[in-house]
Amino acid sequence: MLKFTIPLPPVTKKNHQQIIVNKKTGRPMVIPSKQYKQYEKECGWFVQGKGLKINEPVNVKCVYYMPTRRRVDLTNLMEATHDILVKYEVLEDDNSKIIRSVDGSRVLYDKENPRTEITIDKAE
């Protein structure tokens, strides 16, 4: 079991995107915003288990404590978290063969201490 906390206000990847034009092809491309890239970089300081590259079935439970009561898409938050776990090599990949479930994941409110609590357990 691996459990750790990222003491930063959670940021979604999809709600913070930029559209740019590829200089070579002239086609529009969607890239993460500077805000998301900064969040991803700062998360690296708090992610535990870097380099584990877990490749067996696991349950990834994420509890997001948001700074406001605004509605937020849990799926987008989890997608951003899974991408960060793959980037920092905690998980080998974020496909369904490795992340079997996200049971228990939810969004709560904590104005004073926004954070993300992540628990990774072996899947049964």
State the predicted function of each range:
Residues 1-124:
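Acidic, proline/glycine-enriched N-terminal capping motif
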